[in-house]
From Swiss-Prot:
Protein residues bound to a beta-D-glucoside: 54, 157, 202-203, 346, 418, 468, 475-476, 484
Modification note: Forms interchain disulfide bonds.
Reactions that this protein is recorded to catalyse: Hydrolysis of terminal, non-reducing beta-D-glucosyl residues with release of beta-D-glucose
MF terms in GO: beta-glucosidase activity; copper ion binding; fucosidase activity; protease binding; protein homodimerization activity; thioglucosidase activity
Organism: Arabidopsis thaliana
Position of sequence motif Prevents secretion from ER: 521-524
Protein name per its UniProtKB record: Beta-glucosidase 23
Length: 524
């Protein structure tokens, strides 16, 4: 299905891209009559992203230990679309070929993650270090650098060592803090001399909410009144505890990073994943007020804490005793504990205030006193949603979210760690259909334009952008049915890669203008 047209889309390639006046505060954008790399400030990085569990495979090589998702998908195959990451897209064996695919796209950077159990098979250094696993990431990082691609490394992208999960419940226990700091410090010391961009945690909201409040992702915990599939868990409690331990772990890891001599000159942050919200009913003042509350619960929960040192006051007021408290020392470590804001943006929703919460059935969504709606009070959808789309497409929300972060958090540096379009092709899935991904191409066009407007008009300090994803891969509870890649992976025929129309578009977009690697370092 061809994507429904939205305002500006028909004019996109004819539009004269706004240039910044040279004396304006904020980013300076060159004049351009076509949206491309040349429409952005010099030095702006463009790349693609993946995560270890979603692409590597090779779960029995390099003495890798079991990860949370390995066991979860074996125990509950129906909750992983009867798929798993045992082989994934075999990036472990094909990374050199895949790096050539990155070069083909003219990208500058690649976001990857390190699998904790591939480094410490049993979760802790004292129980053994996999030197083969350590060497694999050295080889991967070196190959990226050799090919002119800057590595961005995520320390934790949801692959908790199963041994720690079995021993004390993983992030449900404060014992995770010491173990995570040890692991993070190890990878900083090992790779910090050549990796200068780090992300401690990917999407802490998704990890805690989906894993411990609604049970849609591993470890699949929640109360039965939220999801009957959950066999254990306590909604409205565990998600807050997990995030609390995660944030303290982040602060400890950042302290270790800032003491790392090899790491000098680098930056560290978190990749957040909020939606943007519009009022469900513009005539209802409560819906308007609910937007700030929604953003505090989905973004401020983590970003307020790592910026100001504590949770948003509205969360303290509503959640009450169920929200753990930080010590004075923890607050001091958390405050200003990031060098940039990592942002993953996919979609937006309407925010409808919740009239009658049920205190006997607490959960994160109810605590925020809103419901998420895909249509407003007038029955209009937010953006568009093609038949195969996983999420509604609303690029205006991208720009609004960027401006919100600039205004609330004193204009921090922002890096777009993920932005992409997922689609489920179903019975029509084939190489021919999957590579003709015009909807994804239009999604990228519109979101790149919205980001360019945020940078060049709103003066938001965005410095990098990564498409999710380089390749179709294992998409958690959706398995392999939900495709996000710029390259189609043929799961029926040797995992062969095929460039999609979106990949051709991104390559053309990046072919114009000066790559950061072509600039002198003192010009950046």
């Amino acid at each position: 299905m061809v994507l429904q047209k939205l305002p500006l889309i028909g004019l996109l390639l004819l539009l004269t891209i706004v240039a910044s006046p040279a004396n304006a505060d904020g980013p300076v954008c060159p004049p351009s009559n076509k949206l491309s790399r040349a429409s952005f400030p010099e030095g702006f990085l463009f790349g693609t992203a993946t995560a270890a569990y979603q692409v590597e495979g090779a779960i029995n090589e390099t003495c890798r230990g079991p990860a949370l998702w390995d066991i979860y998908c074996r125990r509950y195959p129906e909750r992983c679309n009867n798929d798993n990451g045992d082989v994934a897209v075999d990036f472990f064996h094909r990374y050199k070929e895949d790096i050539q695919l990155m070069k083909n796209l003219n990208t500058d950077a690649f976001r990857m993650s390190i699998a904790w159990p591939r480094i410490f098979p049993h979760g802790r250094k004292e129980k053994g270090v996999s030197q083969a696993g350590v060497q694999f990431y050295h080889d991967l990082i070196d190959e990226l650098i050799k090919n002119g691609i800057t590595p961005f490394v995520t320390v934790f992208h949801w692959d908790t060592p199963q041994d720690l999960e079995d021993e004390y419940g993983g992030f449900l226990s404060e014992r995770i803090v010491k173990d995570f700091r040890e692991y993070a410090d190890f990878v900083f010391q090992e790779y910090g001399g050549k990796v200068k961009h780090w992300i401690t945690f990917n999407e802490p909201w998704v990890f805690s909410h989906a894993g411990y409040d609604v049970g849609k992702k591993a470890p699949g915990r929640c109360s039965s009144y939220v999801n009957a599939k959950c066999q254990d868990g306590r909604s409205g409690y565990e998600a807050y505890l997990v995030t609390h331990n995660l944030l303290i772990s982040h602060a400890e890891a950042v302290e270790a990073y800032r003491k790392c001599e090899k790491c000098k000159g680098g930056k560290i942050g978190i990749a957040h994943s909020p939606a943007w919200f519009e009022a469900h009913d513009l005539a209802d003042s409560q819906d308007g007020a609910s937007i700030d509350r929604a953003l505090d619960f989905i973004l401020g929960w983590h970003l307020d804490t790592t910026t100001f040192g504590d949770y948003p006051q509205i969360m303290k007021d509503i959640v009450g005793h169920r929200l753990p408290k930080f010590t004075t020392e923890q607050k001091a470590k958390l405050k200003a504990s990031t060098d940039f804001v990592g942002l993953n943006y996919y979609t937006s929703v309407f925010s409808n205030h919740l009239e009658k919460p049920d205190p006997s059935k607490p959960r994160w969504m109810q605590d925020s006193l809103i419901t998420w709606e895909s249509k407003n009070a007038q029955n209009y959808a937010i953006g568009s949603k093609p038949l195969t789309a996983a999420l509604n497409v609303y690029s205006r929300g991208f720009r609004s979210l960027l401006k919100y972060i600039k205004d609330k958090y004193a204009n921090p540096e922002i890096m777009i760690m993920e932005n992409g379009y997922g689609e489920e092709l179903g019975a029509s899935d084939s190489v021919a259909v999957g590579t003709a991904d015009h909807n994804r191409k239009y999604y990228l066009q519109r979101h790149l334009l919205s980001m360019q407007e945020a940078v060049c008009i709103d003066k938001v300090n965005v410095t990098g952008y990564f498409v999710w994803s380089l390749l179709d891969n294992f998409e958690w509870q959706d398995g392999y049915k939900n495709r996000f890649g710029l390259y189609y992976v043929d799961f029926k025929n040797n995992l062969t890669r095929y460039e999609k129309e979106s990949g051709k578009y991104y390559k053309d977009f990046l072919s114009q203008g000066v790559r950061p690697s072509a600039l002198k370092k003192d010009e950046l």
